[in-house]
């Protein structure tokens, strides 16, 4: 595991790995020539507003003690430097340790996507895929694993496993 030394083990009770979830949002506008933007409905500014608004979800829509990550990792739009594209695709990942926080993030992302598009007279397709739930170790089994590890490598080589936003 990253950060661990050879011969060390780690285990802890509670959340240890985040849920893994993917999203794809396709913003639909109306393409046109860049010299005549008034004849188009440019989806690029819509996408930019949306990405910025997503950054407020964790800081303003979840409790400060609840961990979560919203990462927009791919933005695809257009093929030419003088043409306003018809659409923009945003893709990324969402990570959390609880289903409740995940529900809230998905709800807010959908609202932000739909309302941002409406404000610009664009439309969107919103896809959210829940791939894996969070890994949450029970106290009893985590303690059993720690005792077994300690019997093999010694108690000083068994560390507390910090939660990670990495996933299964």
Stretch-by-stretch model annotation:
Residues 1-85, 167-168:
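Histidine/acidic-residue-rich, glycine-tolerant segments that coordinate divalent metal ions
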Residues 21, 80-89, 112-124, 138-141:
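A glycine-rich, aromatic-flanked flexible loop/lid motif
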Residues 25-27, 88-96, 126-130:
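Short, hydrophobic beta-strand segments
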Residues 37-40, 44, 95, 99, ...:
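Hydrophobic alpha-helical scaffolding
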Residues 46-61, 108-120, 144-152:
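Generic non-transmembrane alpha-helical segments
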Residues 59-69, 82, 116-127, 155-163:
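Flexible, glycine/charged-enriched surface loops at secondary-structure junctions
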Residues 81-106:
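A conserved active-site cap/scaffold subdomain adjacent to cofactor or substrate pockets
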Residues 127-168:
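An extended, acidic, His-containing surface patch that forms the Zn2+-binding/catalytic region
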